[in-house]
Curated annotation (Swiss-Prot):
Transmembrane segments: 2-22, 26-46, 92-112, 128-148
Protein name per the record: Uncharacterized protein L282
Swiss-Prot/TrEMBL keywords: Membrane, Transmembrane, Transmembrane helix
Compartment annotation: Membrane
Main location: membrane
Mode of membrane association: Multi-pass membrane protein
GO CC annotation, single: membrane
Length: 152
């Protein structure tokens, strides 16, 4: 059940996925779809860290799917960087002037760091579940906001 909770917390990905689809930006659509599916599967079978039980796959399989999740994150950063550069060049003014985006990015990434702190200590599993679910909601919300207000 714990794995399912963290896996389902990827649901907010439908916002940036839907927006990129409506804007006919199929590369971004594919990138966000990839990371959200990889994250969903990774968290569903996760049993190699955080004391999560998984759903019966080996720890090696859990680790490999976690690497797919990380790959999706890297691809997403690359894609969003490309979109930003194409629209704004090297200036950071649109980000710095957008106080909401600037202010929300910091706590969202703090949630990620807190959720991944001491990932091999099963006593921190509850903290991991809560903060990682909040990370998913936050990062996909930021993706949507960034696409809608900075890129498109």
């Amino acid at each position: 059940m714990e794995n399912l909770i963290v896996a389902i917390s990827n649901f907010p990905a439908v916002l940036p996925i839907g927006l990129s689809f409506l804007k006919r930006d199929f590369i971004t659509f594919g990138t966000i779809t990839f990371v959200s599916i990889a994250s969903f599967i990774s968290h569903l079978i996760e049993n190699h860290k955080h004391g999560m039980p998984g759903i019966g796959f080996s720890q090696q399989t859990s680790y490999i799917w976690n690497r797919f999740d990380v790959l999706g994150c890297i691809l997403s950063v690359a894609r969003f960087s490309y979109l930003y550069y194409n629209r704004h060049g090297l200036t950071v003014v649109p980000i710095v002037n957008n106080k909401w985006l600037f202010a929300m990015t910091i706590p969202v990434f703090i949630l990620l760091r807190v959720s991944e702190y001491d990932k091999y200590n099963p006593n921190l599993k509850t903290r991991y579940i809560i903060t990682h679910c909040m990370w998913h909601a936050g990062i996909f919300g930021l993706m949507y906001y960034f696409l809608k207000n900075i890129v498109y």
